[in-house]
């Protein structure tokens, strides 16, 4: 096992899959000569050349459409959006072409492509560059959506995403790229659609995904000091969703808190909370709590920026609420 950063784990996954399959190529803004906006693609241009590591203009709609066409023609593009905030410009290609092509063609066309890049709040990026747009993509039939929070999960799931014959949305985060964790030296993959219990507990299930995992684990440690044993369920894959792991955890703890850094209305977290409320009704000893960002545009002021997002304190308060403490 080696300890590497999240960005290094992504780079290893891309490098290994490009070496394994000559149909795999990378395209996006600054992925080549600049080594990626977040240095994920460091060294790949030198290794694979301009035919397989392609810098693009600042036109998400255009190069995402190029990736869709390349996938339909038999290649396996990895399309990097510098940020998912910019990806809104490419929604037509994602929603109306990539997601629907297999269905509309009666299975004659596959669209084996990955769209990856940072999603969600970062720091000092204000309203237009610090948004969690997860639900935009989980809402669309035909897309798979993955949101890993550790280097181990990121590498294993990205390799699986690249090998998948369907369009996969791969959600990362600016603040996660420097996170470190253990990653096996030997090759491995992680199946899409499997959650992971990051911490076992008996008193309350805290369900989350992506960047909030870190503060959820911190909250669980603080709760443990007060005698509250929280189980942490990391979804990792949002679509397909591992409902069985969620329900098994709630059946054990009888209480559930969902943490999602998106806005609360129609968020993926609110969908998970609804699923638990509906399917675990007889197991629940308290209503499900949702900890989300506030329903406001992201402020630029750092104190306000932190105030509108989920926090350790908010998660602990929600856990205590479902425990009637």
Walk through the language-model features, giving the residues of each.
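Thiamine diphosphate
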Residues: 1-167, 171, 306, ...
